[in-house]
């Protein structure tokens, strides 16, 4: 629990794990005095709002059907749609290091377009120009100290974007966040990450109760307590634990549920066992965190594992593709030692969509020639020449160009690709690699120009315009991932008529069909310490196969097949809706079919 300040009024609610017999008297009461209207119709919550929330909850519960033992079934008729709160460490375009930021940039607007009320809660890593101070403050116990956090807010594409403001987030990052959300550089974590994300989880539980958001013409007032929280990856795995220990034990959020989404099982939040005391959770949760592995990082021996706790304490576990869901329970190799834990709870796989407004060849501002499925064959050669010129390769529209865009780390297989280039670079082909990540991998791709001056280029920079140029101008997109929960690069590529050449893992299996929309290389060895020569050969062999098809009738049909697909969030959002409705949260109903409430707006991401 937390202390809540709205305008200049503070009322205290004591945190802790034990329940109180007079819970109602401990609820935060925020009065009418000095109430401020701040921006976009947002104002501080007041006593009238609190009473209205309680009355609505009572009226709703009176309509709930009872089971034989008198407990509520959970479905109440009190409006349309669900109250959804996505909690996450990053959200595009404000903060993004990879697919997680893209997903929560695109899925929430799609859910809003389906008639649901949607909020996202993430850290405020920078002074975002389009997010404004709500003047709502809460005090949260983090470790041994009481920390004060503020909420910033903006309303975009039908979604309440809420940002948790605290120096623990701001002091880590300057300018665009790049890869410094989780650590000072790739592969290194901040030492206080357990405190940073503990604060995020607790603040996220307060946001639906204390923020009186009225920006939408469809919904107004606080979200209240009948909500579905969607926690994402290990950074938010404490949320179901705090929900139970700090709220439900005191009679609050009784009908709320938590869906826990695994975007990447490789990152689990493993800390030393002694760090459990920093989380301010009762001992009854220790078993959910308890974990033992054979590694010496961060400490040798027994540890706590945040993701394990998130899986066990949530009401539903979901991941980002059906095939990845099967891989996670297939054994310790793909499940990264949590396969047995996931098997106990079951898991649902829902393939990701993509942002078809940002990634649209017909309107893309980063390419010189816009096109659609009817003009792609005319536009591609022109865009290829522009791409070749931009990176300094010989300009020739007849040479097949292969692209790679991604993080330079073991998961994405950039080291396997670099090792394979020598095996096919003698063919009539050029290759362009764009990415940032581990320094040794950045150095590898930067050396390509020296090794193959007329054949290859490596750009170790964060370069959005070039990413769009490669996606549009390349003929093939290589995705050599050792494992890939879902993947967005192959979706972007197909949207632009660029044929994927991909490993057969995770969401790549679900989204790319061999011989119809792409070429599969087979599954790779997930051992990251070395490059498996067999995987190098798989890349070389499949590239040769793709180059042999280049320019053929079958190749042109594959381009058409790629571009004819609906890769938007519309279908995945409906699958998410079905899954979340099955949790039976009070007030939940199917949303009203429609489109996104607002078109893509120009986002002012960060101050210069």
UniProtKB/Swiss-Prot annotation:
Cellular location(s): Plastid, Chloroplast; Plastid, Amyloplast
Stretches the record annotates as Disordered: 1-24, 588-608
Record-level Gene Ontology MF annotations: alpha-1,4-glucan glucosyltransferase (ADP-glucose donor) activity; alpha-1,4-glucan glucosyltransferase (UDP-glucose donor) activity
Tissue specificity remark: In leaves, flowers and fruits. Observed in all floral whorls at early developmental stages, but restricted to carpel before anthesis.
Main location: plastid
Listed CDD domains: GT5_Glycogen_synthase_DULL1-like (cd03791)
Sorted UniProt keywords: Amyloplast, Chloroplast, Glycosyltransferase, Plastid, Starch biosynthesis, Transferase, Transit peptide
Catalytic activity: [(1->4)-alpha-D-glucosyl](n) + ADP-alpha-D-glucose = [(1->4)-alpha-D-glucosyl](n+1) + ADP + H(+)
Any GO BP annotation: starch biosynthetic process
Entry's Gene Ontology cellular component terms: amyloplast; chloroplast
Family: Belongs to the glycosyltransferase 1 family. Bacterial/plant glycogen synthase subfamily.
Name recorded for this polypeptide: Granule-bound starch synthase 1, chloroplastic/amyloplastic
Species whose genome carries this gene: Antirrhinum majus (Garden snapdragon)
This protein's encoding gene: WAXY
């Amino acid at each position: 629990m937390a202390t809540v300040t709205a305008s200049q009024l503070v009322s205290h609610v004591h945190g802790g794990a034990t329940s109180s017999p007079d819970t109602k008297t401990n609820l935060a009461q925020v009065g009418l005095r000095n109430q401020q209207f701040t921006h976009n119709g947002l104002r501080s919550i007041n006593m009238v709002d609190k009473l209205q929330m309680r009355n609505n909850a009572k009226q709703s519960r009176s309509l709930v059907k009872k089971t034989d033992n008198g407990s509520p079934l959970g479905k109440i008729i009190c409006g349309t749609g669900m109250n959804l709160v996505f909690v996450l460490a990053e959200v595009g375009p404000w903060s993004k290091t990879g697919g997680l930021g893209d997903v929560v940039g695109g899925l929430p607007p799609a859910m809003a377009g389906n008639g649901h009320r949607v909020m996202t809660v993430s850290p405020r890593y920078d002074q975002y120009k389009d997010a404004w101070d709500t003047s709502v403050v809460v005090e949260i116990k983090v470790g041994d100290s009481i920390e004060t956090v503020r909420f910033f807010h903006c309303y975009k594409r039908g979604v309440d974007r809420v940002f948790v403001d605290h120096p623990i987030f701001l002091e880590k990052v300057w300018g665009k966040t790049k890869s410094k959300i989780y650590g000072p550089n790739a592969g290194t974590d901040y030492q206080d990450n357990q405190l940073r994300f503990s604060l995020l989880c607790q603040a996220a539980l307060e946001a639906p109760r204390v923020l009186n958001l009225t920006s939408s013409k469809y919904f107004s007032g606080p979200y209240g307590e009948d909500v579905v929280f969607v926690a994402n990856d290990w950074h938010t795995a404490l949320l179901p634990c705090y929900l139970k220990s700090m709220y439900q034990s005191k009679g609050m959020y009784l009908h709320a549920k938590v869906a826990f989404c695994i975007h990447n099982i490789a990152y689990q939040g493993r800390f030393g066992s002694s760090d459990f005391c920093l989380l301010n959770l009762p001992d009854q949760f220790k078993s959910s965190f308890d974990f033992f592995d054979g590694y010496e990082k961060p400490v040798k021996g027994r540890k706590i594992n945040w993701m394990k706790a998130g899986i066990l304490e949530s009401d539903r576990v979901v991941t980002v593709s059906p095939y990845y869901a099967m891989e996670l329970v297939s054994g310790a190799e793909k499940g990264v030692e949590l396969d047995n834990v996931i098997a106990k709870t079951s898991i649902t796989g829902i393939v990701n969509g993509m942002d078809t407004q940002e990634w649209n060849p017909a309107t893309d501002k980063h390419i010189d020639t816009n096109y659609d499925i009817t003009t792609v064959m005319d536009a591609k050669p022109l865009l290829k020449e522009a791409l070749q010129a931009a990176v300094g390769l010989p300009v020739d529209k007849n040479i097949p160009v292969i692209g790679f865009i991604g993080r330079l780390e073991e998961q994405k297989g950039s080291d396997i690709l670099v090792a394979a280039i020598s095996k096919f670079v003698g063919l009539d082909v050029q290759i362009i690699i764009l990415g940032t990540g581990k320094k040794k991998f950045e150095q590898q791709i930067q050396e390509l120009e020296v090794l193959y001056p007329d054949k290859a280029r490596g750009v170790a920079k964060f370069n959005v315009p070039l990413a769009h140029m490669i996606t549009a101008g390349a003929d093939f997109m290589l995705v050599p991932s050792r494992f890939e929960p879902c993947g967005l690069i192959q979706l972007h590529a197909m949207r632009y008529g660029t044929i994927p050449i991909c490993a057969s893992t995770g969401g790549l299996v679900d989204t790319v069909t061999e011989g119809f929309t792409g070429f599969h290389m087979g599954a790779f060895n997930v051992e990251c310490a070395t490059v498996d020569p067999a995987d190098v050969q798989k890349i070389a062999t499949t590239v040769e196969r793709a180059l042999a098809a280049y320019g053929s009738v079958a190749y042109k049909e594959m381009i058409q097949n790629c571009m004819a697909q609906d890769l938007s969030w519309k279908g995945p959002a409906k699958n998410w809706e079905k899954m979340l409705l099955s949790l039976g949260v009070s007030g939940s109903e199917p949303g009203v079919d429609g489109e996104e409430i607002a078109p893509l707006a120009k986002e002012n991401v960060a101050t210069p």
